[in-house]
C-alpha cells in the first residue's frame, strides 16, 4: 500500500480460512518472502503470506466483526510518520519470528 501506516494482524497460516469470495482472490508473488492476495473486483489488499516466517498478515479491513486493538509497531526503523502512542516500536520483527526484536524509542 502507499499509506504511511497500515493496520494488519499476524496469524499462523493454518488459523486463516477464507469463508467467502474465494473466486475474487487474486495473487501476486513478489518473491520468496511474500505472496500477496487482493480482491480482483475492487483491487483491495487482503493479505500477505510470509512463508519464511510461517505467518500470514491479514489487513484489518478484510476482517468482519474483529475487535482490533493495536499492540505494537513493526518495521518502525523505516517509518516516515512518527507515532507517539505509547506502543512498543520494533525495528523490524519480534525475535521469535526471525526479527531482531530490537525496540526503538518514540
Protein language model annotation of sequence segments:
Residues 1-106:
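A short Gly-Trp-Pro
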